[in-house]
UniProtKB/Swiss-Prot annotation:
Keywords: Actin-binding, ATP-binding, Calmodulin-binding, Coiled coil, Cytoplasm, Methylation, Motor protein, Muscle protein, Myosin, Nucleotide-binding, Phosphoprotein, Thick filament. The rodlike tail sequence is highly repetitive, showing cycles of a 28-residue repeat pattern composed of 4 heptapeptides, characteristic for alpha-helical coiled coils. The modification Phosphoserine is found at residues 36, 79, 392, 625, 1092, 1096, 1162, 1237, 1243, 1261, 1278, 1288, 1292, 1303, 1306, 1413, 1474, 1495, 1514, 1542, 1547, 1554, 1574, 1600, 1603, 1714, 1726, 1739. Expressed in type 2b myofibers in the tibialis anterior muscle (at protein level). It comes from Mus musculus. This is Myosin-4. The gene is Myh4. Residues 1128-1147, 1153-1172, 1276-1299 are annotated as: Disordered. Residues 1284-1299 have a biased composition (Basic and acidic residues). PANTHER family: MYOSIN HEAVY CHAIN, NON-MUSCLE (PTHR45615), MYOSIN-4 (PTHR45615:SF79). Transmembrane segments: none annotated. Gene3D superfamilies: 1.10.10.820, 1.20.5.340, 1.20.5.370, 1.20.5.4820, 1.20.58.530, 6.10.250.2420, Kinesin motor domain, Myosin S1 fragment, N-terminal. GO terms for molecular function: actin filament binding; ATP binding; calmodulin binding; cytoskeletal motor activity; double-stranded RNA binding.
Length: 1939
């Protein structure tokens, strides 16, 4: 506590800041009983002081100060603090902390007019309602540089602490001044600005005045003057406050690197423009109106055409017109002066006053209704003329635009009539808009004036927001203000209670989390979250028919009863109507919603706006131009692009945007809180209402803040910082010369200091202190430093005195010597012999001439020798001098290059600032776009509700349809039962008819099942289609962001090229300067060379000196003259020498710089100094010798004088060059300092921008997620509605079709019954004929042998086809079952995946938000650590001894940064995983879409097949009638055909053996592939994330293969159905075989297509293999991600197992397809035999077989590729190895069979060599086997030719039917081709989309990498600039010390 003497510096403010010593002593000596002195609860006063009299049974009886005796419970009694704590400055120091103690401490301090009190970490101030002398200049000076504990509580102390934190922590600061309206926020804001403007004034006022040009005041004056101007136009009187800020402002004061004031800017929020046209009774409008009418400046009254009576103007006279505490006349002069100081031009100043006057005139405009019309018309034009005059408009045009505005309808404009009320509303809207835009324009102009373009490093922001206030009539503006205060209170709570405790947990300190119950999230979410009040308001604004009532109904429907903070208002008598109530932190507020929709939309008369834009008043035209609109919406002074294009932005949306930006700014700074309190409602000085103050304390969290300050550790410091700063307290605790960890060093240091060791804790990276301990350590450090400095001063003074004493002794000895000689001379002066000596001595001069000549000759020889030696030394020194000069030039070049680099860096900094501004604009656009989407979402949500109502109605219709459908189903089942009974009756008929009937029934059931499946799949596909559109929209957004990034990169590239060009120009100019300098150096060398020549000439002349000795006497007089000239020359030489010494000092400075870099040239400098001294001595000797010999060189005097003059001129030139270089040097130093500070500012701004970008990106992603969810719901409802409509029509149509089908089946049943009876009768007749012809058959057996064999062969083929058909039917059923189960399963999995994705996205968003907050704190830590590292590097250069320890500390810091950076990368990886999961869902969407389209095609195919079957039934009925005639003949040859069947069976087995042989080959290849796979699998395990995409691509290929196989199955089914028609007749079977051959060719073509797709798959696989090499480089990063991706890998493995099952099914289907291909090959051999018989061209058959063989080989290659593809997708190697082992065993069993087949293949190879040896060599085992079969079949076919001739007639009859069948097959083939085309198209689209996504992702990563590199380069440049700055300062210091 300071003494009275120490408090004297505060002047007259001392009594208002701290108690006097006398009061403190009295308080300590005051009697006090701790047990009896208490506070008790009181109904009126809340708490009163009392004395305990007794305690009984939980009750306490006490006597109050008023003399009353009360009895209360124990929990209503609170202990009183001792008297020494009365009026304590920091309430956290109280012994007993509770509400009454805090209340009475504030009350007692307030009674003593001590309005500022510390409350833990923040400050509380109470409004005194009177002027106190606590803000005088001496108070500002007293608080400057003082620590918090050294001075009394004050707003200046808070400001100075923020200023010091900014300089030491290198972090932006903010001061949040909060409180209710009237608590004194605005006054404290002004005092903060006053303090900064006083202590941090700019350094060079002259320079500022020179650069400011038209600026009429200094920057400090302008910052201070901004407040009066803004208060005049933005402050007004309210019920609770005479000077209430009706807008919010965030003032940022920027400082340079040295803490000097650099610039400032102001952001404003939500001006209450409704006050312009409406005020309550106890309030008034903005001050400016009443200031103008105060008549202080009569010229304004005249210019504005107004009066001095406010009641003459309706807009400003609805409430009070005067305020006792405000002098409007003085305020007008202050406002007018502020306008001048802030640099507004005269025209702008006049425009401001004119627009203000126009607003007042607008309120007096009158309108009336036309007779018999609702149209309004002007009621007089005088007022309109005045308003038009002030705004430079035509009054007639203005009135016309108001009464008859033009409205755009479509593409045309029409004139609209207005009622009187509409005109008044339009005038009011225009007045409010004009005033608001003018206010925002003024803020913009102020910011332009305050932006001095000086380098700025950090800023301190001061927040002054309109306070929480409860009016009788609360509107939308009041809701916004209260919501802002709610958010700020939540920010305070989160910072004070949540972040503080999270810091303890993170640092590992034992701490139990305390929930203070201060979370305001419920109220905030009620207002701002989706479907909150703002959301509903904006949604209603989009509906043209929305009203206030509909808005209120939606609010009640959405929130009443669901949220405790939303209540119905309780009507009160005498108060305005209210529609809903909100429970805020500071009280419950009733809100009236009348006019909210119009206020939020803020409509303007566009016709009048058009007039404004053309106004002759330039300021008005600018206000309503497009550019100003953008600026106005930017929140005052912040430049930004145009907001939302053609759409509009509501007031609430703009307010939320500005508020979010404010909260982002605050989160990026270190906040300091100042809590302003209202003492009473009556504005009475000194009075305090207890309940009011307690309510504010509770709401503001004051008590909780004190508690956490007392319990927690509010002070914390990094271990390295603590070690560096406090090591001086006990240096012996930390051993020197050995490394010790900073944490251990801190622990040892604290353990060795005499302090309370319970007052601190050690965290992981910091040491934490209780409140006050750090101040104690600071005091101890100051004392220790004082001791050390005292000792140092004593040692220095002793040394200096010893040096002085030594000099005194030397002078004493010299004086003694002189005195002795003088005394001796005085003794002999009168001696006669001495007198004679004096007389004779001059006469002996001539006699002694010869001696003198001899002496002179000797002297001459000595001088000559000395001259030679000196000349040699001079040359040597000149060479060294040249070398040093060269070194100096090199160093100067280096300095110049560094200066150029710094200039380049400055230009880059400027460009980065511009880029930052552009990025901020883009961020604004993105935010606005996101808000647009939110608005659209809100609109769509409303539509969703309507659709839900419609859906409920449609559901009722669906229920009715379902009932009808159930009836139809019953009828259908009954019909199916009848058909089943008929089928059972027909079971005894012929086998062929039974099979046909079963097939027909199966197809009907499949048809019905397919229809049902189709309906179910349509629903699923609709859902998936919506997901696809959502993903496509996301891809579009990514592409848009990518385009923006490309544009930004192009801009940066252009800026880079421009900077490089500027750099080249600067380098060229530098080179020119260097060339000039080198030329001057060369001239100097030339002159020095001439001097050496002169010296040599002098030597020559000295030889002539002997001859000229006779002339010495004559020249002695001349010598005296020359001596005078020589003296002058010596003076000039001395001057040149001084200049040379200056150059030497420059050289020494540069050498010192080198010494700082390397520390190796100090010895050289000392040697140079010695040599320089020797050189000076020699030169002096040389000059003396020269002067002696100049007596003999009179002839050369003139030349010598000329040369000296010339050298003098050169020296003057050099002096001028030196001065120029000195000037450039000083300028470069200044530029270096500026650049350093600028670089620091840019780096900080860049960090803030990155934080802002990340925050906005998170917000954007959250908004997009919400938007997509809403869009998906709406699309689902729309599609469901459309689907239900179509379903109802489809059901009706299907019902009609089923009825027709039932009737048709009934008719077919009757016809079949008749046909069966007829066939039975025919069968009996044929049986009789058979018995009669049995004998004839035996006699003709020999002739029919061949026919029997042929029949058996064909019968076998028929049986094979029947088996294949049955197998195909079973496969169809299997595929259908699988499709249904897979579809259902996939749908369920998709739904589950979607839920998981939504949950994970939500978790990811929460995690990202948490990580962002961590990143923000880490960014601050990183910046602080980086700056500290720079300081440490400076310490390293100063002290090499501590280098090792500091390097280790630097590495520790780097590790911490790397760990946090890794965490950041891991978080980013999680986000990427979420994106990839989204992409996997998109692939599932494509799969289901393909399946859906296939099912549609199957439905169409089945419909056509149904029609064809009906046609076939009729055809078969006719054929059966004919077939009955041939049954008898077929029975005859049955035995022959059975024999042929056995032969065909044998050949089939041989073909199967060959196929198994080929499969053995495939298995061997598979083993090899498994080996390769085992090698690749290791790499794949490390790259699950990248290969997952490839797996999806391959899965789509397999699915396309499956669709192709399905098409093949359908085509084979068609072929089988065609063949069944031919079963009754042998000729028909032959033609059917021919048809089957064509079908086989088509199947082969399908296989070719499949092979093509497999080739594409192989290409993708090759690309993947090549990409593996690239992926190796990413191995390290993937390993770090492996742990985080483990959960995703588990899920992917589940999907991989499903994929594996699908692959196995595909492989099985592939084997089945191979078997069916083999079967088709067998049929083809029969077809080829028939062709040979018909065409007799074996060579053509061989060619065709070669083609077939080639296709078979391609099929083989396809199998290989499919296996390779499957191997790439495989994850579980053991299953594959087991399969390989099993196949290996099969291979060994089949080796013997292969050997037998090899013999046959050799024979076939010899036969095939005739047709072409080269092709036969390429054929493999299966081809050889097929050729052997061809040869065997040829032999049998030659024998069967005879039988075929007998059947030629029947072939001709069946040709027509074959042609019909061929047409059917062609149609089916066309359908298959179309399906395959669709599959390929979908596949290509999917691949293109994936490729595009990958390309975008790669580009994004590349851009991110480049951004990181740019950041690193900026950091490096910043560190270099700081080093240069430090070096420059040290050099400057040394120069000063040397001078």
């Amino acid at each position: 506590m300071s003494s009275d003497a120490e408090m004297a510096v505060f002047g007259e403010a001392a009594p208002y800041l701290r108690k006097s010593e006398k009061e403190r002593i009295e308080a300590q000596n005051k009697p006090f009983d701790a047990k009896s002195s208490v506070f008790v609860v009181d109904a009126k006063e809340s708490y009163v002081k009392a004395t305990v009299q007794s305690r009984e049974g939980g009750k306490v009886t006490a006597k109050t100060e008023g003399g009353a005796t009360v009895t209360v419970k124990d929990d209503q009694v609170f202990s009183m603090n001792p008297p020494k704590y009365d009026k304590i400055e920091d309430m956290a120091m109280m012994t007993h902390l509770h509400e009454p103690a805090v209340l009475y401490n504030l009350k007692e301090r307030y009674a003593a007019w001590m309005i500022y009190t510390y409350s833990g970490l923040f400050c509380v101030t109470v409004n005194p309602y009177k002027w106190l002398p606590v803000y005088n200049p001496e108070v500002v000076a007293a608080y400057r540089g003082k620590k918090r504990q050294e001075a009394p509580p004050h707003i200046f102390s808070i400001s100075d602490n923020a200023y010091q934190f900014m300089l030491t922590d290198r972090e932006n600061q903010s001061i949040l001044i909060t409180g209710e309206s009237g608590a004194g926020k605005t006054v404290n804001t002004k005092r903060v600005i006053q303090y900064f403007a006083t202590i941090a004034v700019t350094g060079d006022k002259k320079k500022e005045e020179a650069t400011s040009g038209k600026m009429q005041g200094t920057l400090e004056d302008q910052i201070i003057s901004a407040n009066p101007l803004l208060e005049a136009f933005g402050n007004a009187k309210t019920v609770r406050n005479d000077n209430s800020s009706r807008f919010g402002k965030f003032i940022r004061i920027h400082f340079g690197a040295t803490g000097k004031l650099a610039s400032a800017d102001i952001e404003t929020y939500l001006l209450e423009k409704s006050r312009v046209t409406f005020q309550l009774k106890a309030e008034r409008s903005y001050h400016i109106f009443y200031q103008i009418m105060s008549n202080k400046k009569p010229e304004l009254i005249e210019m504005l055409l107004i009066t001095t009576n406010p009641y003459d103007f309706a807009y400003v006279s609805q409430g009070e017109i005067t305020v006792p505490s405000i002098d409007d006349q003085e305020e007008l002069m202050a406002t007018d002066t502020a306008v001048d100081i802030l640099g507004f031009s005269a025209d702008e100043k006049v425009a401001i006053y004119k627009l203000t006057g126009a607003v007042m005139h607008y309120g007096n405009m009158k309108f009336k209704q036309k007779q018999r019309e609702e149209q309004a018309e002007p009621d007089g034009t005088e007022v309109a003329d005045k308003a038009a005059y002030l705004t430079s408009l035509n009054s007639a045009d203005l009135l016309k635009a108001l009464c008859y505005p033009r409205v755009k309808v479509g593409n045309e404009y029409v004139t609209k009539g207005q009622t009187v009320q509409q005109v008044y509303n339009s005038v009011g809207a225009l007045a409010k808009s004009m005033y608001e835009k003018m206010f925002l324009w003024m803020v913009t102009r102020i910011n332009q004036q305050l932006d001095t373009k000086q380098p700025r490093q950090y800023f301190i922001g001061v927040l002054d927001i309109a306070g929480f206030e409860i009016f009788d009539f609360n509107t939308l503006e009041q809701l916004c203000i209260n919501f802002t205060n709610e958010k700020l209170q939540q920010f305070f709570n989160h910072h004070m209670f949540v972040l503080e405790q999270e810091e303890y947990k993170k640092e590992g300190i034992d701490w139990e989390f305390i929930d203070f119950g201060m979370d305001l999230a419920a109220c905030i979410e009620l207002i701002e979250k989706p479907m909150g009040i703002f959301s509903i308001l904006e949604e209603e604004c989009m509906f043209p028919k929305a009203t206030d009532t509909s808005f209120k109904n939606k609010l009640y429907e959405q929130h009443l009863g669901k949220s405790n903070n939303f209540q119905k208002p309780k009507p009160a008598k005498g108060k305005a109507e209210a529609h809903f109530s909100l429970v805020h932190y500071a009280g419950t507020v009733d809100y009236n919603i009348i006019g909210w929709l119009d206020k939020n939309k803020d409509p303007l008369n566009e016709t009048v706006v058009g007039l404004y834009q053309k106004s002759g008043l330039k300021t008005l035209a600018f206000l309503f131009s497009g550019g100003q609109a953008a600026e106005a919406e930017g929140g005052g002074g912040k430049k930004g692009g145009k907001k939302k294009g053609s759409s509009f932005q509501t007031v609430s949306a703009l307010f939320r945007e500005n508020l979010n930006k404010l909260m982002t700014n605050l989160k990026s700074t270190h906040p300091h809180f100042v809590r302003c309190l209202i003492p009473n409602e009556t504005k009475t000085p000194g009075a305090m209402e207890h309940e009011l103050v307690l309510h504010q304390l509770r709401c503001n969290g004051v008590l909780e803040g004190i508690r956490i300050c007392r319990k927690g550790f509010p002070s914390r410091i990094l271990y390295a910082d603590f070690k560096q700063r406090y090591k001086v307290l006990n240096a012996s605790a930390i051993p020197e010369g050995q490394f010790i960890d900073s944490k251990k060093a801190s622990e040892k240091l604290l353990g060795s200091i005499d302090i309370d060791h319970t007052q601190y804790k050690f965290g992981h990276t910091k040491v934490f202190f209780k409140a006050g301990l750090l101040g104690t350590l600071e005091e101890m450090r100051d004392e220790k430093l004082a001791q050390l400095i005292t000792r140092t001063q004593a040692v220095c003074r002793g040394y200096l005195m010893r040096v002085e004493f030594k000099k005194m002794m030397e002078r004493r000895e010299s004086i003694f010597c002189i005195q002795y000689n003088v005394r001796a001379f005085m003794n002999v002066k009168h001696w006669p012999w001495m007198k004679l000596y004096f007389k004779i001595k001059p006469l002996l001069k001539s006699a002694e001439t010869e001696k003198e000549m001899a002496n002179m000759k000797e002297d001459f020889e000595k001088a000559k020798e000395d001259l030679a030696k000196s000349e040699a030394k001079r040359k040597e020194l000149e060479e060294k001098m040249v070398a040093l000069m060269q070194e100096k030039n090199d160093l100067q070049l280096q300095v110049q290059a560094e200066a150029d680099g710094l200039a380049d860096a400055e230009e880059r900094c400027d460009q980065l600032i511009k880029t930052k501004i552009q990025l901020e604009a883009k961020i604004k656009e993105l935010t606005e776009r996101a808000e647009d989407e939110e608005e659209i979402n809100a609109e769509l949500t409303a539509k969703k509700r309507k659709l839900e109502d419609e859906c409920s109605e449609l559901k009722k219709d669906i229920d009715d349809l379902e009932l009808t459908l159930a009836k139809v189903e019953k009828e259908k089942h009954a019909t199916e039962n009848k058909v089943k009974n008929l089928t059972e009756e027909m079971a005894g008929l012929d086998e062929n008819i039974a099979k046909l009937t079963k097939e027909k029934k199966a197809l009907q059931e499949a048809h019905q099942q397919t229809l049902d499946d189709l309906q179910a799949e349509e629903d699923k596909v609709n859902t998936l289609t919506k997901a696809k559109t959502k993903l496509e929209q996301q891809v579009d957004d990514l592409e848009g962001s990518l385009e923006q990034e490309k544009k930004l990169r192009m801009d940066l590239e252009r800026a880079k090229r421009k900077l490089e060009g500027d750099l080249k120009l600067a380098q060229e100019s530098t080179m020119d300067i260097e060339n000039d300098k080198q030329q001057l150096d060369e001239k100097l060398k030339k002159k020095e060379f001439e001097m050496s020549n002169l010296q040599s000439k002098i030597e020559d002349e000295q030889a002539l000196g002997m001859q000229l000795q006779k002339k010495i006497k004559e020249l002695q007089a001349r010598i005296e003259e020359l001596e005078e000239e020589i003296e002058a020359e010596r003076a000039s030489r001395a001057k040149a020498e001084k200049q040379r010494s200056d150059l030497s000092r420059e050289l020494e400075e540069i050498s010192e710089r080198l010494e700082e870099a390397g520390g190796a040239t100090s010895a050289q400098i000392e040697m140079n100094k010695k040599r320089e001294a020797e050189f000076q001595k020699m030169r002096r000797d040389l000059e003396e010798a020269t002067l002696q010999h100049e007596a003999t060189a009179a002839a050369l005097r003139k030349k010598h004088a000329d040369s000296v003059a010339e050298l003098g001129e050169q020296i003057d030139n050099l002096q001028r060059v030196k001065q120029k270089l000195e000037k450039e040097k000083s300028e470069l130093k200044m530029e270096i300092d500026d650049l350093a500070s600028n670089m620091e500012t840019v780096s900080k701004a860049k960090g803030n921008l990155e934080k802002m970008c990340r925050t906005l990106e998170d917000q954007l992603s959250e908004v997009k997620t919400k938007e997509e969810e809403q869009q998906r719901l709406i699309n689902e409802l729309s599609t469901q509605k459309a689907r239900l409509h179509t379903e109802s029509g489809e059901f009706s149509r299907q019902l009609d079709e089923k009825d027709a089908m039932v009737s048709q089946l009934s008719r077919g049943k009757q016809a079949f019954t008749q046909q069966i009876e007829e066939l039975k009768r025919q069968l009996e007749e044929e049986s009789k004929a058979k018995n009669a012809l049995a004998h004839a058959l035996q006699s003709a057996r020999h002739d029919c042998d061949l026919l029997r064999e042929q029949y058996e062969e064909e019968q076998e083929a028929k049986a094979e086809l029947q088996r294949a058909m049955s197998k195909a039917n079973s496969e169809v059923a299997q595929w259908r079952t699988k499709y249904e189960t897979d579809a259902i399963q996939r749908t369920e999995e998709l739904e589950e995946a979607k839920k998981k994705l939504a949950q994970r996205l939500q978790d990811a968003e929460e995690h990202v938000e948490a990580v962002n907050s961590k990143c923000a704190s880490l960014e601050k830590t990183k910046q602080r650590l980086q700056n500290e590292v720079e300081d440490l590097m400076i310490d390293v250069e100063r002290s090499n001894a501590a280098c090792a320890a500091l390097d280790k500390k630097q590495r520790n810091f780097d590790k911490v940064l790397a760990e946090w950076k890794q965490k950041y990368e891991e978080t980013q990886a999680e986000l990427e995983a979420s994106q990839k999961e989204s992409r996997s869902l998109s692939t599932e969407l494509f799969k289901v879409k393909n399946a859906y389209e296939e099912s549609l095609d199957q439905l169409e195919t089945l419909k056509r097949e149904n029609k064809n079957l009906q046609q076939e039934i009729s055809d078969l009925t006719e054929q059966i009638a004919e077939g009955g005639k041939h049954i008898h003949e077929l029975e005859k040859i049955k035995k022959q055909i059975d024999q042929e069947k056995s032969e065909l069976q044998a050949s089939l087995e041989e073909a199967e053996a060959s196929l198994e042989h080929e499969e053995g080959k495939i298995l061997r290849i598979q083993l090899e592939l498994n080996q390769v796979k085992s090698e690749i699998d290791r790499k794949i395990a490390e790259k699950d994330e990248e290969i997952d995409q490839l797996k999806r691509n391959h899965l789509r290929v397999v699915e396309s293969m499956q669709s192709t196989l399905d098409a093949e199955i359908r085509s084979r089914n068609d072929a089988l159905r065609i063949k069944k028609k031919m079963e009754g007749d042998l000729n028909e079977m032959e033609i059917q075989l021919n048809h089957a051959n064509r079908q086989a060719a088509e199947a082969i073509r399908n296989l070719r297509n499949t092979q093509g797709m497999l080739k594409d798959t192989q290409l993708h696989l090759d690309d993947a293999l090549r990409g593996q090499d690239d992926l190796k480089e990413q191995l390290a990063m993937v390993e770090r991600r492996a742990n985080l991706m483990q959960a995703e890998i588990e899920e992917l493995r589940a999907s991989l197992e499903q994929t594996e099952r699908s692959r196995r099914v595909a492989e099985q289907e592939l084997l089945d397809a191979s078997e069916r291909v083999q079967l088709l090959h067998t049929q083809n051999t029969s077809l080829i035999n028939t062709k040979k018989k018909l065409e007799t061209d074996i060579s053509q058959i061989q060619g065709e077989m070669e083609d077939i063989v080639q296709e078979a080989r391609n099929a083989e290659e396809k199998a290989k590729k499919a296996i390779t593809d499957a191997a790439m997708m495989a994850e579980e190697l053991k299953k594959e190895q087991d399969t390989s082992a099993h196949l290996e065993r099969m291979k060994k069993n089949m080796e013997q069979t292969v050997k037998d087949l090899q013999h046959r293949l050799d024979e076939a190879e010899q036969l095939a060599l005739k047709g072409g040896k080269k092709q036969i060599q390429k054929l493999e085992a299966r081809v050889r086997e097929l050729e052997n079969e061809v040869e065997n079949e040829q032999k049998r076919n030659i024998e069967a030719v005879k039988g075929l001739r007998k059947h030629e007639r029947r072939v001709k009859e069946l040709t027509y039917q074959t042609e019909e069948d061929r047409k059917n097959v062609l149609r089916l083939q066309d359908l298959v081709d179309k399906l395959q085309t669709k599959v390929k198209a979908y596949k290509r689209q999917a691949e293109e989309a994936e490729e595009q996504s990958n390309v975008n992702l790669a580009k994004f990563r590349k851009i991110q990498h480049e951004l990181e590199e740019a950041e690193e380069r900026a950091d490096i440049a910043e560190s270099q600039v700081n080093k240069l700055r430090v070096k420059s300062r040290e050099v400057h210091t040394k120069v000063i010390s040397e001078e």
